Amino acid sequence: MKVATINRTYTNWGAHCEQALAFTLTGEIRKHDHVPFDRDSDIPEYNMSVKSSGFTLASAKVNHGETFEEKITDFFARVHSTIFAYVANDFTAYLMDKATFEKFIRTFGRLDRESQKNGGGLKIKCLKESQKMIEWLKEA
């Protein structure tokens, strides 16, 4: 699905992609909010979580576990969303169900450490967008 390009109001790429996809689906320009992953979705009427290049799955403070496997298990046991959208750099949105998104994370995610300013905990971070990633999304 092609995402509408709108005037950028956020310097954060992820917030901009979320706003653009929400506009594409609803016709509304919405303010980005920090919705807890286990309570609601980025685009609630579609039960959809929106991600983009280099995203963090969830902050270390709210995603429990000390290993990649523990964090994946915790996230997918508690996540509210049932649809996951990856907005590519060319503004194509790739939609995934929960099982496909988990495979995506297992393929392109890695355990990383938050900055000391944010507590220094472990988090899952997705790699920056690559041709291999786009090919995977097209085949999924």
PLM ranges: what are they?
Residues M1-A140:
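Nucleic-acid endonuclease domains
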